[in-house]
Amino acid sequence: MKQNHSWKGWFSSVRAWGCSVQEKRSYNTLRFPMTNRLILLLYPLFIVCMAELNQDKYPSKLVLFISEHPTIMLFNVLIAALIFTGLLLLFRSGWFSMLVESVIYMALSITELFKYNTNGNHLIMTDMKLARSLKSLTSFAYIKITPRLILYLAICLGFILLAFWFNPRLRKRTKLRKRLLPGLACLICCVMVVTVPAVSRPVYALFRLDTKEADNTFILNEKFENNGFLAFFMQTGSENLSNQLDEPADYAEDSDNAIRQYLASDVAETNFKNGVKPNVIEIMSESFADFRVFSKELEELGYTGLDSYYAGLDKAASMGTEGKFIVPTYASYTVRTEFEMLFGLPVKSLNDPNMPQRMLLDRQQPTIPSYYKSWGYTTAYVHPFQSSFYSRKRIYSNFRFDTMIFEDDFTVPVTTYGEYIDDNVVYDQIESLIASSSEPLYLHATTMQNHQPYSDGDSDDEFLNYLSRIQHSADGLAEMLEHLSEANEPTIVLFIGDHFPSLRGDNGIYNQLNITSENCSDLYEQHYILWNNFNMDISDMPRYRDIMHLVAHVLFQYRHA
């Protein structure tokens, strides 16, 4: 009974304190009108500065940016003011409106900070599509809570607490239905700046935003330097929306069986050279790149003996043929290279989306696997990671794969190397599927072992840790090819890397190599190895091509013209 009275007394005390605070806040609203107006007027400038400061890190850099780009800063403040006005009209409460906008701005700012520090790519609106894969993304990211970040968040919280205490708010007791329309109008104006080209183009021109087209990551990063975080986020959002495919005026839906007309329903054995249907294995190795293209520059930085890390790759190349091809991405967006391999179609033809596979969700597609399927092949997709990432299981099920194997589906013993499933496990799974298939096998594998982060390893240098993983992967590849050489089944193996790795932002190896938009072409070229065990004529294989042309060449290489 005493305890019950104690709880009641405690609750009464808290309630009395809350009432006292509320009375004081109501008094402050009336007592300090000028202070409250100043808080309301300063807030848009404050939150813009905090969001940008979180990227610039030091106040001096923010001041320099404002002095060099005053019109862009004005644009940011006006957008923040429109959002704040809209929220204020909807909620009336100044501090609560500030809380909502601050959470949005600082959440985006922190996400941008972590993303750039992770892979050197800046946050864009289309990245929001990956929000459902937050768990996967956090496993990649270099998330470091620094004292500076804590300080900036504390300053934001302090401003909101100040507003809570002085309690600025709309004085007039206007009913919500009368505030709703102007409040929504303010928010809709902000949305229109991003989504409506007729609005965004003159607005961006007026405030002198950098709107040049960016066909590689380094040009995009230069736009970030010119626009700052907030203007960059909005302008690239507008750009991505304007690049969406428009349905032609005379477009008509295909019939249910339309795709079949492009695919032969039955291909006679005589259509294949010597009547042989070989297994076709595509291995797209995550972040596998040959840094020997920068050997001279790396030696000057103290990185020597690169050949030892690539001995397995050189051995595999000596067993087949090798060349270079152009990939559509750098440091991230594996699905762009994967899309070109699975469709034989350049992402540029779809206006260069970051996640092209999401544009083809509604039906079966005429993919490379579907061609093999029509020729009597068994088809398989192997990816040793979560099936939900990039919605692969849901989307790729339309690509005519008979079997899809993700991290929980392996039928061979699973081990890890670094953070992820060992590439040798993938190689073992490939050999197992070849052995168990009664039909010729087409298989596409996208590995995971060499994905970031590279902070864990024998060295404090993430680049050396990356090279150690590459060495392990390349040695395993050479060993697998030796196994397949001894097998009786005719087999083709195409080994490629999807893109150069994500090696931090400001202090990564790319900055040390002084890579810019003018000299970054090597980062969009990848090595390929084509191997077979049945003396296929590969004398006319291209040594330098786009990835989709390379896949098409392999597709028809062993068939009669």
Where are these regions (language model features)?
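Transmembrane and membrane-interface helices of multi-pass
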Residues: 2-3, 7-222
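Alpha-helix capping and helix-coil boundary motifs
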Residues: 54-66, 93, 225-255, 266, ...
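Helix N-terminus capping/helix-initiation residues
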Residues: 57-58, 93, 124, 146, ...
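Short alpha-helical interface patches
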Residues: 119, 127-140, 147-151, 236, ...
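Membrane-interface micro-motifs in multi-pass membrane enzymes
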Residues: 119, 125-128, 220-228, 232-234, ...
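Alpha-helix initiation and N-capping motif
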Residues: 128-131, 226-229, 238, 256, ...
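Membrane-interface segments at or immediately adjacent to transmembrane helices
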Residues: 197-282
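Solvent-exposed soluble domains appended to multi-pass membrane proteins
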Residues: 265-274, 278, 282-285, 290-561
